[in-house]
Amino acid sequence: MSHLHVLPPRFWLADSVISMSEPMSPSVGLAVVHYFCKPSFEYDGDALVAAVKAAEGAGVTVITVAMLGHKADVAVMGVAADMRELKALQTGIQHAGLDIVDSYISLTEVSEYSKGMPEEMLNARLYPQLPPVGKNAWCFYPMSKRREHKDNWFTLEFDKRKELMEEHGKSGRTFAGRIIQLVTGSTGLDDYEWGVTLFAVNPDDLKEVVYTMRYDEASAVYAEFGAFYMGMVTPVEELIHQI
């Protein structure tokens, strides 16, 4: 009679833990997460500073934002090659006594309509240098393309979609020097298809760019938006005294 040798379950568990601890990185580009937070009674400003510094030491770009309005008191935006470092940042934020009341997960990407764009422009989208100097007015919102029967973006021919997006991009380029925009992809990762992060010199620039681009057909007919969050980019050492 033959006998099968079966490893004890603990060895399988050990192997799975080892594999799970490996970096979780996109094949191209970077992972991006936006955390929107409110302080709990256990809030510890020094612990928040330590969490941010630890993440930065691990190679994460961290942008801290003093938020306006009731939705959140602080936003922490993390950009990293390894999602596990973003998870460590999330844990540090929570251990500092901040309750995460909303969040958004996405990846840097280049548009399917960007064929022929210079390599340096493509790299700027995949590996952005953030935050931009002098642009401390900050806004984030998620969006998707409409899928209604009459206005279904995904049933349009590629050339038509490209034409509409080129028109949309032309409107955005009129704000060069005033706005830095980061569009990140989130299909299959979060509730919408893209996340849009805007940096501006003045808050009215944020309002004007969104208003202007709403008139483009790609937005007016085919776009759906989630909640908007607005705040001011603020160093974490200052931010902890504003929470």
Enumerate the predicted regions with their spans.
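Short S/T/G/P-rich N-terminal loop/turn motif that feeds into the first structured element of a domain
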Residues: 3-54, 81-85, 103-170, 187, ...
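Catalytic micro-motifs at enzyme active sites that drive phosphoryl/nucleotidyl and oxygen chemistry
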Residues: 21-22, 60-66, 88-91, 127-129, ...
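Short, surface-exposed basic-aromatic patches at helix termini and helix-loop junctions that form
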Residues: 89-96, 214-218
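Short, glycine- and small/hydrophobic-rich beta-strand elements in well-ordered beta-sheets
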Residues: 53-75, 100-110, 168-192, 209, ...
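A structural feature that tracks compact, well-ordered secondary-structure segments
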Residues: 35-38, 65, 77-81, 90, ...
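Short, charge-rich binding segments
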Residues: 67-68, 95-96, 130-132
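Short, solvent-exposed beta-strand edge segments and adjacent coil->beta transition regions
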Residues: 32, 71-73, 136-138, 191-195
